[in-house]
UniProtKB/Swiss-Prot annotation:
Record protein name field: Alanine--tRNA ligase
PANTHER family: ALANINE--TRNA LIGASE, CYTOPLASMIC, ALANYL-TRNA SYNTHETASE
Co-factor binding details: Binds 1 zinc ion per subunit.
InterPro entries per the UniProt record, alphabetical: aa-tRNA-synth_II/BPL/LPL, Ala-tRNA-lgiase_IIc, Ala-tRNA-ligase_IIc_anticod-bd, Ala-tRNA-synth_IIc_core, Ala-tRNA-synth_IIc_N, Ala-tRNA_ligase, Ala_tRNA_ligase_euk/bac, DHHA1_dom
């Protein structure tokens, strides 16, 4: 019964569907519009706004099987993955949810019935925990369900603070939270461990399988617990844990999904020991990596992309440990798709090619430095006098060889060695400061402003209408009236102003009434409300006041041009580059558009030209734009593209442009594509690994851009004494002439260096029997230094050469050591000792090294130290 994980997933969802729950698809691993989360890490993440009362759904009961990742931030299981039976970077969370519908009694009943009647788990194998003061939950378990009192365990605040308990659940430092009740399964007395709340609770005998959270509060940044609008329920059951029970095994790695991946990895790598922990690591990591890429995350050096990179590189290192000599990780994707089941792997199957290509590219990139880095780490570990690796070495491995510190710690752990993480953090301080400045993950949620009011939007057809002020917020607090000079957010019962979303900026304009003018500088969405952000210019505005809302027509029109063309651009990119292209972000305002999309290489010039021409062709065809509302399943059947990071309701708005483009979109658009006039790409480049960005202009702005380009072309033609038609030919001739002159100049420099070296060689001094030349040069180009030191070494035959040039604000230097002396004096060490005195750094080979510096005023003093330094080495 339910012997596969896929069958178990289906049974769970069907059970709750028959009990009145809406089956909701798993959301993306990248939380939509939630800067407080790195990754989706619980089933309730996609319902956060519902619990907060900021989002309304057509259903009050839901169930889902949510893909989750815990490998960064507060919820980080990466270090333990592969070494324990139940830690994973990726897992599926089965859950049922009540949004102000049922509460404790029904939630407990649903869970108990599913486990004991549907799955037929023996009741004597189950025990439950509750929050210490939750007497209501105790009564339900004991009196209504019939669980004996001794099998109901109260857990208090056991983590050193109020509400800090295993039985008080919270998603993060802020957000929905509440007491919870957990159901545990007893794997039997042949496994060590004790019941929850005992000293032996960390053993593997009693395993939590279901957590039922009674969502009652919204935790604020200051720790205050504010009651949620309606008590709700959030539950979670890890599918891997319940699958292990149903399949009669103890470790999650023994269930069907992991066994298939482990066996495939073993076959690829030629490994026969299926119990090898490295195989577990690889089997776990392919799940998180593949699904993260499928959800739009690409390997990079910051944010989510860096977490993905860390996981991939950890898997590759374990493959290397098992003897991998070529790329292997990406080859597991087909097996993963097969074993996950059609429903769970649908998104992965659609992006299989891009996932495999991205994994292979990252693996090949890391392979170029992996062996060398491991060699350096191995040498450092062999030389250790203690069981702690210094932070400086860990940082060097990170900075030079791309080793995430947890990968270094992973290698060290296998030899019972720890990493000096404090030392590593000191070395990383500069990089961390830059990352923090980027401010990727903020702690505020919706800027703390939760508005209960709802606003109707009339802006698809009207740019002005009368409306009633339903709420005013000043400095985050609700107020009844405001006066001239006040900066506030005004909410209307209906409005033509578009609230920023989907990449389209919020409208600007004015709200007016007798003696009143309110300047709107931005418009934002707050749940179901549309907030008009701005300042009172004149008069007093009160809640209940009737005003006329006027959108700035010119700004709106220019924004619509840019928004509509992003749809054409998206379709054109997919047609020219391939269907793997998907939108990763956009910015649309009155001045320009910015469009981010997935692609594995720079867009070639001819491809960019083809995209631009294709978009302009669709503009000239003057397609009519149509917008219609339909249920999301119908929209998908029509081929409408959904955009990365966006949340959609059960009913969606579909915007169609002829037979060329169809997308889900709530934004505003032109009436016909011909209204756009002209589309001109101004730049294309990479912003992260696998993510490209196009910036462009439309309409009058595009015409102005073309006119400016034409003016610059004519100016260039005049400088070249020709016309615009001859610019390329004349410029090519000029470049050829310049190249020839540069060659002649280089030859003259070489002759000068040879002549100079003959004079300089005679200035060498004897230091302990070795000829040493230390010289600060005047009037010599930095590019001639290398050739000059080569000439001098040849003339000296055996000796050391130190040459330096001082500019206004910089120093260039080179050190040459003849081969017979490198055993005693190394050029890299010598140049580094000089460079540090002039505010620089450098390095190179034992026989030749270069350096630069930013303190020319210290050069003379630094050069005076060279001969004593060499003398000490030779002694």
């Amino acid at each position: 019964m339910y012997q596969t994980t896929a069958a178990l997933r289906s049974a769970f969802l069907e059970y709750f569907r028959t009990n009145g729950h809406q089956v909701v698809d798993s959301s993306s691993l990248v939380p939509a519009n939630d800067p407080t989360l790195l990754f989706t890490n619980a089933g309730m993440n996609q319902f956060k706004d519902v619990f907060l009362g900021a989002d309304k759904r057509s259903y009050s009961r839901a169930t889902s099987s949510q893909r989750c990742v815990r490998a960064g931030g507060k919820h980080n299981d990466l270090d333990n993955v592969g070494y324990t039976a139940r830690h994973h970077t990726f897992f599926e969370m089965l859950g049922n949810f009540s949004f102000g519908d049922y509460f404790k009694e029904e939630a407990i009943h649903f869970a108990w019935t599913f486990l004991t009647e549907e799955l037929k788990l023996p009741k004597e194998r189950l025990c439950v925990t509750i929050y210490d003061t939750d007497d209501e939950a105790f009564e339900i378990w004991n009196k209504k369900i019939g669980v004996a009192a001794e099998n109901i365990i109260r857990i208090g605040d056991n983590k050193g603070a109020a509400y800090a308990s295993d039985n008080f659940w919270q998603m993060g430092d802020t957000g929905p939270c509440g007491p919870c009740s957990e159901i545990f399964y007893d794997h039997g007395d042949h496994i060590w461990g004790g019941r929850p709340g005992t000293p032996e609770e960390d053993g593997d005998r009693f395993i939590e399988i279901w957590n039922i959270v009674f969502m009652q509060y919204n935790r604020q940044a200051d720790g205050e617990m504010k009651p949620l609008p309606k008590p709700s329920v959030d539950t979670g059951m890890g599918i891997e844990r319940i699958a292990a029970i149903m399949q009669g095994v103890h470790s999650n790695y023994e269930i069907d999904i992991f066994q298939a991946l482990i066996k495939k990895a073993a076959a690829i790598l030629g490994v026969t020991d299926l119990e090898n922990k490295s195989l577990r690591v690889i089997a776990d990591h392919i799940r998180s990596c593949a699904f993260l890429i499928a959800d739009g995350v690409m390997p990079s050096n910051e944010g989510r992309g860096y977490v993905l990179r860390r996981i991939i590189r950890r898997a590759v290192r374990h493959g290397n440990k098992l003897g991998a000599t070529e790329s292997f990780f990406y080859k597991l994707v087909p097996t993963l798709i097969e074993v996950m089941g059609a429903d769970a792997a649908k998104g992965l199957q659609e992006t299989q090619a891009i996932v495999e290509k991205s994994l292979k590219a990252e693996e090949e990139q890391f392979a170029r430095t992996l062996e060398r880095g491991l060699g350096i780490l191995d040498a450092a570990l062999n030389e250790l006098a203690t069981n702690v690796l210094d932070g400086e070495t860990a940082f060097k491995l990170y900075d030079t060889y791309g080793f995430p510190v947890d990968l270094t710690a992973d290698v060290c752990r296998e030899r019972d060695i720890t990493v000096d993480e404090a030392g590593f953090e000191v070395a990383m301080a500069a990089q961390r400061s830059r990352a923090q400045a980027a401010g990727q993950f903020e702690t505020d949620y919706n800027e703390g402003l939760i508005i209960d009011e709802q606003s109707g939007f009339t802006g698809y057809t009207d740019l002005n209408n009368q409306a009633t002020v339903t709420a005013i917020f000043k400095a985050g607090e609700s107020v009844d009236s405001i006066v001239a000079g006040d900066d506030v957010v005004i909410v209307l019962d209906n409005t033509p102003f578009y609230g920023e979303s989907g990449g389209q900026c919020g409208d600007e304009g004015v709200l007016i009434a007798d003696g009143i003018e309110f300047t709107v500088t931005d418009t934002q969405k707050y749940g179901q409300a549309i907030g008009h952000i701005g300042r009172v210019a004149t008069g007093t505005v009160k809640v209940g006041q009737v005003v006329t809302a006027n959108v700035d027509k010119k700004l709106r029109h220019r924004t619509e041009l840019n928004h509509s063309v992003t749809h054409l651009l998206h379709a054109a990119l997919r047609q020219v580059l391939g269907t793997h292209v998907s939108q990763k972000g956009s910015l649309v305002d009155p001045e320009r558009l910015r469009f981010d999309f997935s692609h594995f290489e720079g867009v070639k010039a001819h491809e960019l030209k083809e995209v631009e021409e294709l978009v302009n062709t669709q503009i000239r065809r003057n397609h009519e734009l149509t917008a219609e509302v339909m249920d999301i399943e119908t929209a998908k059947e029509k081929g409408a593209m959904a955009l990365f990071g966006e949340k959609y309701d059960s009913e969606v708005r579909v915007v169609t442009m002829g037979d060329f483009s169809i997308e889900l979109c709530g934004g505003t658009h032109v009436g016909r594509t011909g209204d756009i006039g002209l589309f001109k790409i101004t730049s294309e480049g990479g912003i992260a690994a696998g993510i490209r960005r196009i910036e462009a202009v439309t309409g009058a702005a595009a015409m102005a851009y073309v006119a400016k380009q034409q003016a610059q072309l004519e100016e260039a033609a005049a400088l070249l004494k020709g016309d615009s038609a001859s610019v390329v030919a004349k410029l090519k001739a000029q470049l050829d002439k310049t190249k020839l002159l540069e060659k002649e100049l280089s030859q003259l420099k070489d002759k000068l260096a040879a002549a100079t070296s003959a004079d300089l060689a005679g200035e060498a001094v004897d230091v302990n029997g070795v000829k040493v030349l230390v010289k600060k040069l005047e009037g010599v180009d930095a590019g001639a230094l290398r050739g000059l030191q080569d000439e001098l070494k040849q003339k000296l035959q055996s000796g050391i050469v130190v040459l330096a040039i001082a500019g206004e604000d910089k120093v260039n230097m080179i050190v040459g050591v003849t081969k017979d002396l490198t055993g005693k004096v190394k050029a890299g060490e010598l140049v580094a000792s000089i460079a540090v005195q002039v505010g620089g750094k450098g390095g190179g080979r034992p026989d030749m090294a270069q350096a630069g510096g930013s303190q020319p005023e210290n050069l003379d003093a630094a050069l005076e130290q060279v001969i004593p330094w060499i003398s000490a080495k030779l002694a």
